[in-house]
Structures are given as C-alpha cells and as structure tokens.
Design a protein with these regions (language model features):
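ATP-binding N-lobe of GHMP and related small-molecule kinases
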Residues: 1-93, 111-120, 155-157, 167
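Solvent-exposed alpha-helices and their adjacent loops that cap or buttress functional pockets
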Residues: 31-32, 127-128, 134-137, 155-159, ...
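Glycine/serine-rich anion-binding loops at beta->alpha junctions
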Residues: 84-113, 131, 233-245
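Residue-level signal for inorganic ion chemistry
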Residues: 11, 39-41, 65, 98, ...
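Contiguous, small/hydrophobic- and glycine-enriched helical/loop subdomains that border
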Residues: 102, 106-143
Length: 267
C-alpha cells in the first residue's frame, strides 16, 4: 500500500512569547502544497525501513516513520512491516516533510490493518511525534497556535494562483533561528489578515524568522526579492527556512533562480 505525503508552507509566522518550558508560543497558517514524497508499507518477516531519493541524514532507526510505527504498535497488535520512503521533499526546508511522512504512515497503518481510528485519535498519535505532525492527518488549511500543535480550521484557497517553491543549497538551524528572534506585538491578527487577498499580504503578513535568518543568509533574502521582482504577489520564507515560496497570479518560470537552487513549479 502506498501513499504520497505532501509538504506544507507557512503563511505568516508570529512568535508570540517564550514559554516557561523554553518553547515558544507562535501563530501561523499552515497550507498544504502538492510537493510529495512516496511512502510504501508492506507486511514483512521483520521490521525494516529503507529509503531512496534525497539522502536522509542520521541513523535510519531514528526516522520518524519508525517512531510512528512503534508508537502505534504499543497500543495495537501490528505485524512486522517493511517501510520504504522515496524522499523528494527537501530536508531542513521548513516544509514539514518528515512530519508529513510520519503522519501519513499513521494513516497507512490505520487503513491497511483496519484499525478504524478516528482523525482525532490519529492526531493524538501524531502530536506525540512532533508539534506540526498532527496537521497532516486532516491535511487542510489551519491556523496553528500554541507550540504550533493546536489548530483551528480556516477557509483559504490558493488554487487559482501559481505557487513556486525555491530551495537554496543551505541549511538553517531552527534553534539558531529562534535565538535571533525579537518578539514584537502584532497590529492585526493573522486570521483577520487571511480574509485579505494575497495581493494585499506583502506588507502585512510577516514571518518573524526572516528578521533573524536573512542577515545570516543573504542568499535567502535575495531569493525572496527575486520572486517579487519576477511578479509574485506575495513571497515568504516557510517556517525557519531555508525554502522560500512565491505566489503568482499566472504561470511563470524563473531560470535565474534555477542556476543555484532547486525550483519547484506549480506546487
């Protein structure tokens, strides 16, 4: 059985305050996009995880897909399986690829083995793996708050726009991005701003991580500027980077950006 875990982008990201547990409270809109991995699950003699495509750093035994399997196996009698992940979503990009893979595995296990778990139960499993994992269970636009693990549905449809995603050959440390953050009050609530057309977002919908990341990585700032110069109605870094997306009102190509970056069109 195979499924295709998709990426997400963050539209606006406000760091609200620092919590007593040293995490931060934030507000952001998460929006699913069509850039996808491929995830296959088959029964096997022994539990096994393999991958292809983009090389996944670290020990494969620490992969979030295996973590999801073990989490569900602790509550349900599951047979050994072979999990194969073909990685296409860039890693360390602020696109939630690893979280999506783990959440889609939860959905795969639920379907393949007839567990008949509700979305809320699967969200509970996913939230134990990572703060944004539960988003990918329902996989529709939400306003996320708290640590980024509490969600409220919103109406947002960008299907009439052309989205371009740019991934530079850079890695941004999320911890380092947080260290450079200056917490500032917001003048208008993000859910209110989502009632505006994307053409009105440029000077109002901000990603707070850009203030700490752009000075250290001017190449990422340059990508955002290039997207606007090419006609994007809105452009932003996703999450803590390093990817940047542009929302265009018509199909476009960006050969200048293709020379040094991965560029994904029509996501």
């Amino acid at each position: 059985m195979i499924q295709f875990p998709n990426a997400k982008i963050n539209i606006g990201l406000n760091i609200v305050d620092r919590r007593e547990d040293n995490y931060h409270n934030l507000e952001t809109v998460m929006y699913p996009v069509s850039l996808r991995d491929a995830l296959e699950l088959v029964e096997a003699k022994d539990l096994k995880f393999t991958s292809s495509g983009i090389s996944i750093p670290g020990n494969s035994n620490d992969n979030l897909c295996l973590k999801a399997y073990h989490l569900m196996a602790s509550d349900h009698k599951l047979p050994p399986v072979h999990i194969h992940l073909h990685k296409h979503i860039p890693i360390g990009a602020g696109l939630g690829g690893g979280s999506s893979d783990a959440s889609f595995l939860i959905k795969l296990i639920n379907k393949k083995f007839g567990l008949n778990l509700s979305d809320s139960v699967m969200e509970s499993y996913a939230s134990e793996i990572g703060s944004d994992c539960a988003f990918f269970i329902k996989n529709k636009p939400v306003f996320a708050y708290g640590k980024g693990n509490q969600f409220r549905d919103i109406e947002l449809d960008l299907s009439k726009y052309f989205l371009v995603l740019v991934m530079p050959p850079l890695h941004v440390s999320t911890a380092e991005a947080y260290r450079g953050i200056s917490i500032r009050p917001v003048s208008r609530h993000l859910t209110e701003l989502m009632n505006l057309a994307p053409e009105e977002w440029k000077h109002q919908v901000k990603n707070d991580f850009e203030d700490s990341v752009f000075p250290k990585f001017p190449q990422i700032a340059g990508i955002k500027s290039t997207l606007y110069n090419a006609g994007a109605v809105y452009a932003s870094m996703s999450g803590s980077g390093a990817s940047v997306y542009g929302i265009f009102d018509k199909e476009t190509t960006l050969p200048d950006l293709e020379r040094e970056n991965q560029v994904f069109y029509g996501v």
